[in-house]
UniProtKB/Swiss-Prot annotation:
Organism of origin: Datura stramonium
InterPro entries per the UniProt record, alphabetical: NAD(P)-bd_dom_sf (IPR036291), Sc_DH/Rdtase_CS (IPR020904), SDR_fam (IPR002347), TR (IPR045000)
Keywords, ordered alphabetically: NADP, Oxidoreductase
UniProt EC number: 1.1.1.206
The encoding gene: TR1
Gene3D superfamilies: NAD(P)-binding Rossmann-like Domain
Residues that, per the record, bind substrate: 158
Catalyses which reaction(s): tropine + NADP(+) = tropinone + NADPH + H(+)
Designated name of the protein: Tropinone reductase 1
Keyword field contains NADP: yes
Transmembrane portions of the chain: none
GO biological process: tropane alkaloid biosynthetic process
Length: 273
């Protein structure tokens, strides 16, 4: 094969596996899986904007990313507030000149209680953060995603949206809703060249989970029960989730939409609980 043709093929291949020149908004990017997602996308060439409720944590992260040479900006946002969500998207539109390639609805909360003990406040926090905020952000991001001519929406679901897990009925309901929303938006927005997918992690060893395990023997027992039923025999790492999200955003994944992909070491394939 002629050298020029080989060079052209290599160039095209690199483009399929790169996020260079793209823009991304990642919610809840100051810790855990969100932090890994920000680093993953920025490391692959994307300009990333993120948000957090905690200003101190966010500022520390932004400084670390600057030192690493990553193109990341961010601001404080309480995603339970519709007004603050609107303000966030206005800022993103300004920073990225009205175009957004990637929206990762990562931010989420979980409260552990028996179903009979959940309060109205619990309901508002869980459904407001996990479902309403993600839905609304997708709505107001739609013009920016469409304008990019290559839009991607990624939702963070969970194995709890598929398997019945103990003491998280509201959380499970919010993730089940996310799964159905993924399919609906994927079909509705395909005509606008916007792909919509969900990633559903299993047990992931974030710093918060590791701290909880050390402080609470019951928490460690619950995690161990998950791992016993996981064919790969271990918990996952945040980077193993962020890598899957990056893949779904690559041009190489251009025919994948409407999917809920489990990143759980085989837990759901093995029947869950």
């Amino acid at each position: 094969m002629e050298e020029s043709k080989v060079s052209m093929m290599n160039c095209n291949n690199e483009g399929r596996w790169s996020l260079k020149g793209t823009t991304a908004l990642v919610t809840g990017g100051s810790k855990g899986i969100g932090y890994a997602i920000v680093e993953e996308l920025a490391g692959l060439g994307a300009r990333v904007y993120t948000c957090s409720r905690n200003e101190k944590e966010l500022d520390e992260c932004l400084e670390i990313w600057r030192e690493k040479g990553l193109n990341v900006e961010g601001s404080v946002c309480d995603l339970l507030s519709r007004t603050e969500r609107d303000k966030l998207m206005q800022t993103v539109a300004h920073v990225f000149d009205g175009k957004l390639n990637i929206l990762v609805n990562n931010a989420g909360v979980v409260i552990h209680k028996e179903a009979k003990d959940f309060t109205e406040k619990d309901y508002n926090i869980i459904m407001g953060t996990n479902f309403e905020a993600a839905y609304h952000l997708s709505q107001i991001a739609y013009p920016l995603l469409k304008a990019s001519q290559n839009g991607n929406v990624i939702f963070l679901s969970s194995i709890a949206g598929f398997s019945a897990l103990p003491s998280v009925s509201l959380y499970s309901a919010s993730k089940g809703a996310i799964n159905q929303m993924t399919k609906s938006l994927a079909c509705e927005w395909a005509k606008d060249n916007i792909r919509v997918n969900s990633v559903a992690p299993g047990v992931i060893l974030t710093p918060l989970v590791e701290t909880a395990i050390k402080k609470n023997p019951h928490q460690k027992e619950e995690i161990d029960n998950f791992i016993v039923k996981t064919p790969m025999g271990r918990a996952g790492k945040p980077q193993e989730v962020s890598a899957l999200i990056a893949f779904l955003c690559f041009p190489a994944a251009s025919y994948i939409t409407g999917q809920i992909i489990w990143a759980d070491g085989g837990f759901t394939a093995n029947g869950g609980f």
